[in-house]
């Protein structure tokens, strides 16, 4: 193996046209790796800090020249000369160099860019695919995609309170077929929306964001689209949705408010019943952030009620942080974690969170952010860790499709070794729950 000889960062743009950090790592044996950091719109308050310049005269304050300078002038001095394959030592060195619990000094965007670029440089030097470098010979499970085809909440300008409505091709035999099923359902949905005179422009993650009469109408359109594409709802293609409940929670009143639609308010008990009714009515297999991120006891209450029936995913709740995840596991809160690289800020900590979840019987869903790039690391990471599920947007926008295309390449490379588990990737649910989802 060889040592890192140079690190260089620059400011580039993400899928929303906002600045982000790109880093390149070079080794003495000729290895080169590049990593680009994504950015979120709906963010958890406990996420690692994304360092922005704050200069209102430049990119509206969203520039990242400070983070870029931290890579070129601070991180590079520490990391150049280290062994490129010693990912853990490199990540720990950057964490120590920052010295804050939330990476607020150097910026998680600066640290993550170098972390990702390091792994790619090592894989390039060894002349192996990234998934193979990260996961070894056991990397073989192709993920069940979670495709965001209808946007609401903070991801749109419509009157829908829930942030994302997704389809999951749980009955597909391969990831290539799963992507085909998702694409066909996506186009069937577009036709159904157009037939009813609804807008079919797409949002940040490639999903449609038309106006709807209420929060249940998107589910009805998903059912219609799945059937129009020739599939059975629940059995072939299941439904998932992201509530993003922290966006709806009023901490003063201690109530959830549907402020994008009707303005109705719910106590926690009423809210849990409201969500339970929706889950019972439609073939829902997964619900993300159904409870406010700071209401731990309420998460436990919901998990006790629904945890064997449906996947309950902590995103803002866990923020890819092993401390929060360990607390949730101990309390019995949620049964799944959404994995976002930039929530925690290094590849090492991300893999630690995935492994902790799997050991506890929680599923781990490797996820994109709403502000994405052409970087396809998450496609390799989900296969490397055999996580089993990926959330990376809809069937439009190149920044989303880049990940799906990479998954198909990986499946081709793996050949007969590749295994797509579909509904079996939900090892956190009972067999009866899976049957019930198929029959709704």
From Swiss-Prot:
The keyword S-adenosyl-L-methionine does not apply. Its main location: cytoplasm. Binds a second Mg(2+) ion via substrate during catalysis. Catalyzes the reversible conversion of 2-phosphoglycerate (2-PG) into phosphoenolpyruvate (PEP). It is essential for the degradation of carbohydrates via glycolysis. This is Enolase. Mg(2+) binds at residues 242, 288, 315. Pfam families: Enolase_C (PF00113), Enolase_N (PF03952). It comes from Limosilactobacillus fermentum (strain NBRC 3956 / LMG 18251). GO terms for biological process: glycolytic process. (2R)-2-phosphoglycerate binds at residues 163, 340, 369-370, 391. The keyword Metal-binding applies. Pathway: Carbohydrate degradation; glycolysis; pyruvate from D-glyceraldehyde 3-phosphate: step 4/5. Belongs to the enolase family.
């Amino acid at each position: 193996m060889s040592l890192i000889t140079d690190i260089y960062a620059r400011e580039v743009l993400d899928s929303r046209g906002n600045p982000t950090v790109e880093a390149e790592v070079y080794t003495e044996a000729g290895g080169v790796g590049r990593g680009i950091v994504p950015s979120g719109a709906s963010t958890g308050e406990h996420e690692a800090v994304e360092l922005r310049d704050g200069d209102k005269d430049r990119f509206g304050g969203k520039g990242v020249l400070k983070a870029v300078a931290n890579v070129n002038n601070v991180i590079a001095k520490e990391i150049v000369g280290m062994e490129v394959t010693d990912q853990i030592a490199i990540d720990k060195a950057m964490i120590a160099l920052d010295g804050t619990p939330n990476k607020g000094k150097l910026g998680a965007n600066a640290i993550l860019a170098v972390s990702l670029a390091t792994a790619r440089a090592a894989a390039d030097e060894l002349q192996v695919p990234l998934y193979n470098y990260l996961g070894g010979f056991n990397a073989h499970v192709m993920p069940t995609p979670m495709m965001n085809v209808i946007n609401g909440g903070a991801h749109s300008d419509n009157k829908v309170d829930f942030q994302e409505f997704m389809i999951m091709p749980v009955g597909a035999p391969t990831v290539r077929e799963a992507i085909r099923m998702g694409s066909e359902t996506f186009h069937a949905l577009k036709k159904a929306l157009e037939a009813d005179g609804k807008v079919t422009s797409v949002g940040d993650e490639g999903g449609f964001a038309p106006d709807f009469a209420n929060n249940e109408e998107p589910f009805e359109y998903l059912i219609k689209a799945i059937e129009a594409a020739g599939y059975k709802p629940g059995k072939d293609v299941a439904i998932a949705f992201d509530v993003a409940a922290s966006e709806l929670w009023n901490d003063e009143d201690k109530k959830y408010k549907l402020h994008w639609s009707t303005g109705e308010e719910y106590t926690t008990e009423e809210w849990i019943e409201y969500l339970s009714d929706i889950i019972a009515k439609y073939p829902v297999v997964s619900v993300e952030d159904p409870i406010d991120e700071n209401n731990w006891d309420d998460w436990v209450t919901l998990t006790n009620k629904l945890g064997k029936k449906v996947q309950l995913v902590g995103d803002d709740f866990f923020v890819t942080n092993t401390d929060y995840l360990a607390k949730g596991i101990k309390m019995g809160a949620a049964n799944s974690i959404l994995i976002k690289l930039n929530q925690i800020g290094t590849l090492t900590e991300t893999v630690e969170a995935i492994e902790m979840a799997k050991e506890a019987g929680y599923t781990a869903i490797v996820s994109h952010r709403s502000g994405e790039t052409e970087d396809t690391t998450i496609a390799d990471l989900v296969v490397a860790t055999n996580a089993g599920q990926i959330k990376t947007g809809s069937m439009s926008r190149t920044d989303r499709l880049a990940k799906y295309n990479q998954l198909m390449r990986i499946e081709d490379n793996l050949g007969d070794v590749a295994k797509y588990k579909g509904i079996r990737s939900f090892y956190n649910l009972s067999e009866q729950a899976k049957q019930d989802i198929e029959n709704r």
